[in-house]
Amino acid sequence: KTYIMHNIEPFYGWRDRYIVEEDERSPFFGHQHNQFAYDQKIYNYYVHPQWNNFGSNTLLLKCLYTDYELGYTIIEFIGEWNDFLHNDIEMLIRSIVNPMIAQGVFRFILIGENILTFHGEATDYYEEWQDLASESGGFVTLVNLQDHVRNEMKDIGIHQCLRLDGQVLDWRKYPPEFLLRACIQEALS
């Protein structure tokens, strides 16, 4: 599979309902994207300017939708998830997850189809994240992972902390509530 990174945009179909940079409760509130130039890279590959950097050198994200009343968020990722070299999970928890939990978000749906590879080391931070979410009746689930990424995550035991759900086909055609319901149904089955 050949990846043309700068052509991969975060999903924008729900922007009429939610824009993370306009959400005063979001860690990305007020962030300005360069609309005229590609200024972010993962390794030597430029990526679309709409992705948000949370401090990782190899992994970017976009918070597609957050509903504080129902306490959930949907986050899409692109790049290499590298806990081994960069401790991406610690940065993610400290800069994104903890502030969102403080705002009442306890259900995390992570879209992983653009995670190209995973390098893990330990499950401590994943266990912490699951504990924080489940204390409020929530969960953390990764959906639409590529098979090799799912296997890489299972190899270090992440599937014992977080849900590594299967494919949620054509989720982009539906409202965000559909994805939430699908993840809840999967968790209950």
PLM feature segments, named:
Residues 93-98, 127-131, 159-163:
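Short, low-complexity, polar/charged sequence segments that are solvent-exposed and flexible
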Residues 84-106:
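A short, well-ordered alpha-helical element
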Residues 2-37, 51:
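Extreme N-terminal leader/targeting regions
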Residues 6-16, 148-189:
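A cross-taxonomic marker for long C-terminal extensions/tails that follow the last structured domain
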Residues 67-69, 100-103, 135:
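Flexible, charged surface loops at secondary-structure boundaries
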Residues 105-108, 112-157:
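Amphipathic alpha-helical interaction surfaces in cytosolic regulatory modules
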Residues 46-92:
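STAS-typified acidic loop motif
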Residues 31-34, 40-48, 127-128, 134:
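Aromatic/basic-lined ligand-recognition segments
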